[in-house]
């Protein structure tokens, strides 16, 4: 819990971070002033070693070769790199009906600028039905399936292993959006991902402005950004060496060093323990509110990561979130940057209020939140 303008804020979004993350960020600003991979002086060498260590951490966590881990600005950046790097001109790709705009918008843009066709697969009542819906959309032109591992709106899990097997059987690239799942599920390239994209600031507990593009090395990406890499600098052609090829320009050394401590936190605590803790809090909130008729939960009965999305009658979700903010709770209202998902849920006009606890959330905070929601529901 933190204080803003002397008021306590119980945050159920992307804060707080482990103390070691904040300490690492401060130390990075003070001690690691060099540009990694750009010079031979001690400052540059020291920060290069630090960045390499974090890259190794991420590679070990997700079962990748170290050179196949690229640092990005966020998950959106990583997804754009993967999608646009695979789908250059023409062809067909498939996405799910639970995608974030980080997937939907690049795909839509490619349909307007590169002649890429796309289809949206409907999620079914069962995993097998969902996979079958994807399978039916595959054509001889299909090059890629891009699917979230877990919805950022409701937490619903997609059958990612089965979709990976489907892609492999048809020789199709599989790109996964792991932003809402990495750090909560023990995801690995061994699950069948060709590209796993994720954010550093969510369940990996790193700073904002950090992300990861993790590859199994089967597909070579064309670049969407070219520039200085510190490698083959005498050539105008972008370096072919990884990860430098995908990391043009000065990278976010401060954020990456902080991310390293976030990865350490997750590894030591374990995704399973973190997930179990958050699931208990979601169950607690659901049980405390489920007897109120005017409160509607979305996909609460599905296999999912620990998220609850709800509405109160026909009240705009932004109004509910604003009220909760005034009472000291930070929950996300609106569309959560996921118009495709809200179209699927039938909430494109109202949005939803999203409860997304963390490893630092407590049962006492959830009880206080549920009481506040009950008061609002009773008076509106």
Predicted segments, located by residue:
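Pyridoxal 5′-phosphate
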Residues: 1-380
């Amino acid at each position: 819990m933190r204080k803003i303008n002397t008021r306590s804020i119980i945050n159920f979004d992307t804060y707080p971070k482990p103390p070691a993350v904040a300490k690492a960020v401060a130390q990075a600003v003070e001690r690691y002033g060099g540009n990694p991979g750009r010079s031979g002086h001690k400052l540059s060498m020291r920060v290069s070693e630090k960045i390499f260590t974090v890259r190794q951490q991420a590679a070990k966590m997700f079962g990748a070769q170290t050179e196949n881990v690229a640092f990005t600005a966020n998950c959106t950046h990583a997804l754009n790199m993967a999608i646009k790097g695979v789908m250059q001109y023409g062809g067909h790709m498939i996405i799910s009906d639970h995608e974030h705009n980080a997937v939907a918008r690049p795909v839509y843009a490619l349909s307007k600028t590169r002649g890429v066709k796309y289809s949206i697969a409907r999620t079914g009542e069962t995993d097998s039905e969902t996979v079958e819906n994807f399978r039916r959309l595959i054509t001889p032109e299909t090059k890629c399936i891009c699917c979230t591992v877990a919805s950022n709106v409701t937490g619903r899990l997609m059958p990612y292993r089965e979709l990976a097997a489907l892609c492999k059987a048809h020789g199709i690239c599989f790109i996964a959006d792991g932003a809402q799942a990495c750090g909560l599920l023990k995801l690995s390239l061994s699950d069948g991902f060709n590209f796993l994209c994720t954010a550093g600031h969510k369940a990996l507990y790193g700073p904002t402005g950090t992300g990861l593009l993790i590859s199994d090395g089967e597909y070579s990406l064309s670049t969407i950004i070219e520039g200085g890499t510190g490698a083959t600098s005498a050539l105008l052609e972008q370096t072919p060496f990884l990860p430098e090829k995908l990391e043009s320009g000065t990278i976010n050394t401060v954020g990456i060093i902080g991310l390293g401590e976030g990865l350490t936190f997750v590894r030591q605590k374990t995704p399973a323990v973190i997930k179990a803790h958050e699931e208990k809090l979601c169950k607690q909130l659901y049980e405390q509110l489920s007897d109120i008729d005017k409160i509607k939960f979305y996909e609460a009965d599905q296999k999912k990561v620990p998220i609850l999305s709800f509405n109160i009658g026909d009240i705009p979700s932004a109004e509910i979130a604003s009220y909760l903010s005034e009472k000291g709770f930070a929950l996300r209202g609106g569309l959560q940057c996921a118009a495709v998902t809200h179209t699927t849920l039938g909430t494109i006009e109202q949005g939803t209020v999203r409860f997304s606890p963390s490893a630092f959330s407590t049962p006492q905070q959830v009880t206080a939140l549920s009481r506040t929601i009950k008061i609002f529901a009773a008076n509106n």
